[in-house]
């Protein structure tokens, strides 16, 4: 009897490698790929391997028909490393990345999960620790919590299109607190001591791109900002980063995920809005000096035309929407356009 892989993104492709290694026959179903829709009835498969992002109703429906596996459940069952789960609305990737850098000084470590490195590719690869960035989608579908250490960094409204309410999202995130040991600590050095029992010092922790990344003395690329909580964090930190000088905010993205909620911004001297969702954003943001542009190049040309140097914070506060595939593409494009407009 065949198994079925439901969803063919990063996790789905890792399921494929996993099943091939075990000589298990499978079909693939992906709602967004027409050629991967012609399959047998779902209840005719022995097992179904589900990607985390599929809607909850579909996941529960599949569970009523078959044995359903997620990548985190398989990893819990088969991998022998010490497992550290890190979740939160914001800064989970950065915290996981920094903690893994500290751990790898003395130990072998996997940095896996929602950060973009599939768990199934690292089962029993000899690493002593696994630092796992875990999303609310993964926590929601997780059968049971088998993290040795669980970290909940923060919670603010997010992914309400999936969860339906903030309370549901919050309850899902709090499942991480059912780990053997749990913490709300965000300092990677304190987390390292909590996990290993030892102190460590490393002055030069590397950072991930597009997370409040200072690409020049006067420009910050915070493309990873995809919600209001992360935008507020960036605005607060920009004040110190720009040494209390004026700065402009550049924003774009789709505000539907934030339910088109209104926000009053006081920190920036100007708010410059661009992209296909610009009119919606303009209605959501309350600020005395806000301007609309068709594209990013127009924004940067406008800033270049100013007589004085401009401090620029690019922190969209919304998902990419129709403008970019993801925050990585958005961040990369911002850097390219800065280079083109300011340095050509």
Question: Which residues fall in each region the model found?
Answer:
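Short glycine-rich anion-binding loops that position phosphate/pyrophosphate groups of nucleotides
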Residues: 52-55, 91, 136-138, 157-158, ...
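Short, basic phosphate-binding NTP loop
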Residues: 1-85, 211, 284-285, 293-309
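Flexible active-site lid/hinge loop adjacent to a nucleotide/diphosphate
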Residues: 126-186, 322-328
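Walker A (P-loop) phosphate-binding motif
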Residues: 71-114
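Nucleotide phosphate-binding/pyrophosphate-handling subdomain across enzymes
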Residues: 18, 109, 185-269
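Active-site beta-alpha connecting loops in nucleotide-dependent enzymes
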Residues: 4-15, 29, 227-296, 317-331, ...
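Conserved substrate/cofactor phosphate-moiety recognition/catalytic segment
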Residues: 109-125
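Residue-level signal for inorganic ion chemistry
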Residues: 19, 48, 86, 114, ...
